[in-house]
Amino acid sequence: MPGLFQAEGIVLKSRDYQETDQLLTILTRTHGKLEAIVKGVRKPRSSLRSGTQQLCRSRFLFYAGKSLATVTQCEVQEIYGPLRQDLKRLAYAYYLVEIADGVVMPGQVNQAMYLLLQQGLEALGELEPALVARAFEARTLKLLGLAPRLEACALCQRELKGNGRVAIAPAAGGALCPECRGHQGREYLVSRGGVKTWQQLNRLNWSYLKRLQINPMLMGELGEVMPAFLEYYLDRRLRSRAFINEIGGDNIDGPGKNRPVAQAPGT
């Protein structure tokens, strides 16, 4: 029903709407993901402009209309200034926002994803962006109940023996033993060190990431396979990855040569 309500939220997207308005996609902490109109915000003297920019975290007062909400007031909580001053950090911020937008459906309340996005944006202001992205990917998959099985074959449950590279396939939900390889679509070869790093990212808190030693080669492996898992389960391309690659933002991830190594016939 129509009426006023308050919510803290992060602006995921904005686009021009009519002559002076904008239409925002906002992930709120308590009311899920919603679309809201901000009337007159493109006018030079609009008091709503500062708190309704993309990537802003603000406290909003909404009027719930029959089809769309309208932002009537907003109070800025965080603008994430360091991200706006560094193109690489900004590119990764767009990437995190795109993941959150894909995970949360319209109207769905997902406080855990909201807090994860808030923490990820804060971490981007001080940590290596590629490391933050890998941690964010790992935690998003875990939050969705989709964390891959890495300690044994995801299909036959055989223990993965030896010290060689491990084949990991998004379609299989994790690692594959030699007998199960070649039939699960795209597979990525990841070193044992890369697998261990992924497992660490699943359980480490943000503060510990500051002390984590970054191995560029291992991060390069994970920089291919972890986004592939998210894209597989979201069933969509993460377009902001192209922007990151375009500006060389993944350089810390190493040479980036861990491309898919096998593909099942007909896929």
Curated annotation (Swiss-Prot):
It comes from Moorella thermoacetica (strain ATCC 39073 / JCM 9320). InterPro entries: ARFGAP/RecO, DNA_rep/recomb_RecO_N, NA-bd_OB-fold, RecO, RecO_C. SUPFAM superfamilies: ArfGap/RecO-like zinc finger, Nucleic acid-binding proteins. It comes from the Bacteria. The gene is recO. The lineage of its organism: Bacteria, Bacillati, Bacillota, Clostridia, Moorellales. Keywords: DNA damage, DNA recombination, DNA repair. GO terms for biological process: DNA recombination; double-strand break repair. Involved in DNA repair and RecF pathway recombination. This is DNA repair protein RecO. One of its GO terms (cellular component) is bacterial nucleoid. Belongs to the RecO family.
